[in-house]
Amino acid sequence: MSIIIRVEDLRAVYLVREGTIKAADGISLDILENSVTAIVGESASGKSTIIEAMTKTLPPNGRILSGRVLYKGKDLLTMREEELRKIRWKEIALVPQAAQQSLNPTMKVIEHFKDTVEAHGVRWSHSELIEKASEKLRMVRLNPEAVLNSYPLQLSGGMKQRVLIALALLLDPVVLILDEPTSALDVLTQAHIIQLLKELKKMLKITLIFVTHDIAVAAELADKVAVIYGGNLVEYNSTFQIFKNPLHPYTRGLINSIMAVNADMSKVKPIPGDPPSLLNPPSGCRFHPRCEYAMEICKKEKPKWIRLDGEAHVACHLYEEGRPLK
């Protein structure tokens, strides 16, 4: 598979009254065409910042300090707004976090589809709009006759999430980015959304990138997993290898903390300590205050981004020292 998006040394911050939040610090990864990539990490680790920086949709206090995001060889970060508008939604579509709340409660679903089309300069007749919207709603297992003339308050959380996925697919993008697509949903609805995304990926041969704090969700859906900690990318590998042989101590901690119905509770171990403040992150490796393998160098120097065998990448001094996890 070829690379459809290449992220190089992406750095983004938020300017707040207390100082500068260092939310994405030197992120580099390749997204393969027709693949599913999960960006995984604890809450407030910088996951959403990465995709918002990639798509230039950061809030007003967000700043991109450096880096490149190459899509089909062109840097999205240096494009003028009018150039980006030709790509957004038509080629790269984003379903943001807490998207269920982004539907206007005073507008019917069909009006949301109409607004999306008009905002991107697409000229469809009313009958074409109904036909296209109905097609996308059926793709996400919704009945267009019942949903198109409904207001958001008449829909369940899972239905609203599927409406937003249908809206994102309306102009047939080649890349679909979803920020926490299963958060705030009950377990059964989460399972339905995951299954739906699997079907859409297979049907449309689309590239999916999704953010989640739940590594078990990544296991269900992703081909590759990018593990984020404290605004840093600490591991990037195939999903199979991430679970078979986690390279970074943080990745191992995430996997060991997974709760399952049939789990041996004696083997379920939470990661000790708390995530770092991105306002005043620890020196060196940001995970070192919580890491049982921490060495003196971990407190002083940020580890290098190392490529190991195959697809494996890791940022950990253990590998620089020739002492991998066992």
Curated annotation (Swiss-Prot):
One of its GO terms (molecular function) is ATP hydrolysis activity. Disulfide bonds: none annotated. It is a peripheral membrane protein. Its main location: membrane. InterPro entries: AAA+_ATPase, ABC_transporter-like_ATP-bd, ABC_transporter-like_CS, Oligopep_ABC_C, P-loop_NTPase. The keyword Protein transport applies. NCBIfam families: oligo_HPY. This is Dipeptide transport ATP-binding protein DppD. The gene is dppD.
